[in-house]
Structures are given as structure tokens and as C-alpha cells.
Regions:
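OB-fold and OB-like single-stranded nucleic-acid-recognition modules
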Residues: 1-97
């Protein structure tokens, strides 16, 4: 077996995630944790349940489609989005769509 670099591994995993149609529009229910935003820009939080968490992003261009008053730590929400990898860090997040 030929060794590969970390970059090659992360890019390979990202390619798999991007090509999975089930992850391009997915509905996820969970509780908001770690809510933060950049004034007038993007919203960031973790979506958690009893066992797991996933980072979530709501980009500025999608903020007009949501009621920001309901976004707060501890609130149970449903997020419709896509799973997007960030190969540089070997991470992925749920992005609001």
C-alpha cells in the first residue's frame, strides 16, 4: 500500500462527501449550542443531540430566509442544508440552504 499525504486523504474524503446526493439536501433536528455570529454577516453554531454534534453555518446570503429570533442556545430546531467538507482542516459542517 502506497502512503498518501494528509492533503490527499482529506481531499479524497471531501470528494466522497460532495458526491453523495443524500448529503446535498438533508433535514437534521437538534439543539443549538455555541451560538455566535459576526454582526451583519454569518451565523455559526453547533447542532447537538444526546450523543453527537455537527458544526452549522448560515451564510449571510441565507439570513433573510430565517427568523433569527428563534436562534438561541438550547433551542430545538430543524435545519435543512447540505454537508460541506473543509479539506484544509479535515472537517465538515452542515450549511443552511
Amino acid at each position: 500500500m502506497k502512503p498518501i499525504t494528509v492533503t490527499q486523504l482529506n481531499e479524497y474524503i471531501a470528494k466522497i462527501l460532495r458526491s453523495d446526493i443524500n448529503l446535498s439536501k438533508i433535514v437534521v433536528i437538534g439543539e443549538i449550542s455555541g451560538y455566535r455570529y459576526r454582526a451583519g454577516k454569518h451565523i455559526f453554531f453547533d447542532l447537538i443531540d444526546g450523543n453527537s454534534k455537527i458544526s452549522c453555518n448560515i451564510w449571510e446570503s441565507y439570513r433573510g430566509y430565517i427568523d433569527e429570533k428563534i436562534i438561541d442556545n438550547g433551542k430545538k430546531v430543524i435545519v435543512i442544508g447540505s454537508v460541506n467538507p473543509y479539506s484544509k482542516n479535515g472537517t465538515y459542517s452542515l450549511n443552511k440552504r
